[in-house]
């Protein structure tokens, strides 16, 4: 299950998304009598990434599945916990079991609007930056210096789906509520990845600059540049308005602390797939280009 409904407060968010999962499971049970496995896709919220200072994230790096649930009052804000407990309850005495799979920031392509599509936001931003400043311009990383060098483990959508299939097909090793981190493989920093992403747009990726225009301000002031690009290449002119810029900004600017995952457990159950993180962006962008969502690379 990877369905998600955004709500304005934590309690409503928890109730809505837990009920969403329960309805889905009960419906599946009715039409799939031979059901064997359900995969719950969660994420870094389970480690308390929304409250890094409050829960002391720095003391738990690299993040392991064995980390205990975060303490109250923060635990009550994590709907992943109630979803997990629901599956544990519903699976008791049944012929099916379940696994929880935890990606870090997901890199991928979605054919429709996805508020959490970081790769799409970066692509639109860099395409606009090139349109405004020209090929060869230096594009400073829009976050902070500390964030530029902080460690993380992005998760390409193909790696994520492959791990979920692996868990579903290996219930003897992965079932019974087993929890598994999943990521591209190597720990990375934006200092390693950002210049390579910019290069694809004929830009020079630079370090953060304190006097640079903030990303959200740049996008707000230059939406006409996207409209020009869209008309030139037959793209969706409204995409710049539909993009979840708050999430993109959160991932690049606010997530300025080490948060890498430990992948030992997924390796121990036989999952060995990996990909270069910058390459995962390139593949996602190729899919977006085929879908006429971002301009072609020149």
Language-model-detected regions and their locations in the chain:
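A short helix->loop->beta-strand "cap" motif at the edges of active sites that frequently abuts
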Residues: 29-37
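Mid/C-terminal beta-alpha module of Rossmann-like enzyme folds, strongest
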Residues: 160-249, 254, 258, 262-264, ...
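NAD(P)H-binding glycine-rich loop region in Rossmannoid oxidoreductase-like domains
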Residues: 1-23, 29
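NAD(P)-dependent short-chain dehydrogenase/reductase
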Residues: 94-162, 166
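Active-site Tyr-X1-5-Lys
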Residues: 26, 67-110
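Conserved catalytic-site region of short-chain dehydrogenase/reductase
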Residues: 7, 44-57, 106-109
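Residue-level signal for the nucleotide or nucleotide-sugar donor/cofactor binding architecture
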Residues: 19, 78, 154-155, 188, ...
């Amino acid at each position: 299950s990877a369905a998600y409904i955004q709500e304005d407060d934590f309690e409503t968010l928890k109730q809505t998304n837990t009920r969403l999962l329960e309805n889905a499971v009960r419906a599946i049970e009715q039409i799939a009598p031979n059901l064997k496995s359900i995969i719950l896709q969660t994420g870094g919220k389970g480690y308390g990434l929304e409250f890094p200072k409050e829960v002391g994230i720095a003391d738990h790096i690299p993040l392991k599945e064995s980390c205990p649930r975060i303490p109250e009052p923060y635990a009550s804000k994590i709907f992943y916990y109630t979803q997990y407990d629901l599956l544990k309850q519903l699976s008791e005495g049944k012929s099916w079991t379940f696994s929880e799979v935890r990606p870090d920031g997901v890199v991928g392509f979605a054919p429709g609007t996805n508020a959490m599509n970081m790769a799409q936001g970066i692509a639109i931003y860099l395409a606009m930056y090139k349109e405004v400043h020209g090929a060869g311009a230096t594009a400073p990383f829009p976050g902070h210096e500390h964030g530029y060098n902080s460690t993380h483990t992005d998760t390409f959508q193909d790696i994520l789906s492959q791990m979920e299939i692996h868990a579903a097909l290996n219930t003897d090793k992965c079932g019974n509520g087993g929890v598994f981190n999943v990521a591209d493989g190597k720990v990375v920093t934006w200092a390693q990845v950002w210049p390579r992403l910019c290069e694809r747009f004929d830009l020079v990726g630079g370090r953060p600059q304190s006097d640079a225009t903030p990303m959200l301000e740049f996008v707000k002031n230059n939406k006409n540049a996207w409209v020009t690009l869209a008309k030139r290449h037959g793209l969706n002119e409204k995409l710049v308005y539909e993009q979840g810029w708050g999430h993109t900004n959160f991932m690049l600017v606010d997530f300025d602390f080490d948060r890498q995952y430990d992948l030992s457990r997924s390796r121990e159950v036989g999952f060995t797939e990996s990909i270069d993180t910058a390459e995962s962006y390139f593949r996602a962008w190729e899919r977006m280009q085929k879908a006429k969502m971002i301009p072609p690379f020149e």
